[in-house]
Regions:
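Compositionally biased, intrinsically disordered low-complexity segments enriched
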Residues: 1-18
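Beta-rich carbohydrate-recognition modules and glycan-binding surfaces
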Residues: 2, 27-205
């Protein structure tokens, strides 16, 4: 019996000592969970590949307007130019389809230069209400020099034909396309050049 009691006491002492030693050594007795790495940024458009997505112009002619926009991809750059006419419309845009998962990202980044007029970037997740597609846009400024502009998803404003609507948050895991608009209420020519469009957040510095 005495031998058995000694063994029990030794086991108890060991059980008490082992956790204490682990704490002193800086080792946790609980399982250590390594956090998952954040998703890497994704390039949506680089304008330097043969299989680059096609960009389509949508003018305000669909509303009886007279604005005219033109788009071309050349020398690794998208160029969106034209003339805005505010009467009976007052907008022109270019859009491209790109199915991509941006879950875990904060927003999109564009490297742009232009004529100083403000533009808008649109991110489409295919959300519709009352049979209409919801447009989610945010303004971007341009200067004559190349500048990098970041647009957080939280800055996107949900509208239908320019009128604000209540809508569910952007479904960042199911992005369907990107658009660029000019609708600043001023007649005249415009120019926008885009070097790239990509996401940021996650591992982006």
């Amino acid at each position: 019996m005495r031998v058995r009691r000694l063994r029990v006491r030794r086991l108890r002492v060991r059980r008490l000592l082992v956790p204490s030693l682990l704490v002193l050594l800086g080792v946790s007795a609980r399982p250590h969970h390594v956090p998952m790495p954040a998703p890497a940024p994704a390039t949506l458009f680089a304008f330097d590949r043969a299989n680059e997505a096609e960009w389509d112009v949508v003018n305000d002619g669909v509303m009886g307007g007279h604005s005219a926009g033109f788009v071309e991809v050349t020398e690794g750059t998208l160029r969106f130019t034209g003339t805005l006419v505010t009467q009976d419309g007052g907008f022109t845009s270019v859009r491209a389809r790109r199915d991509i998962d941006l879950a875990g990202q904060t927003g999109i980044e564009l490297r742009v230069r232009g004529s100083g007029r403000p533009f808008e970037v649109e991110i489409d997740d295919g959300t519709r209400t009352y049979g209409r597609t919801i447009s989610r846009r945010a303004p971007i400024a341009t200067t004559a020099e190349w500048t990098t502009v970041r647009v957080p998803f939280s800055a996107l404003r949900s509208t239908i034909f320019g009128r604000a609507v209540n809508a569910a948050p952007l479904d960042v895991a199911h992005i369907r396309g990107v658009g660029l608009y000019i609708a600043d209420g001023k007649d005249g020519t415009f120019r926008l050049e885009v070097d790239y469009i990509r996401s940021y957040g996650g591992d982006t510095p």
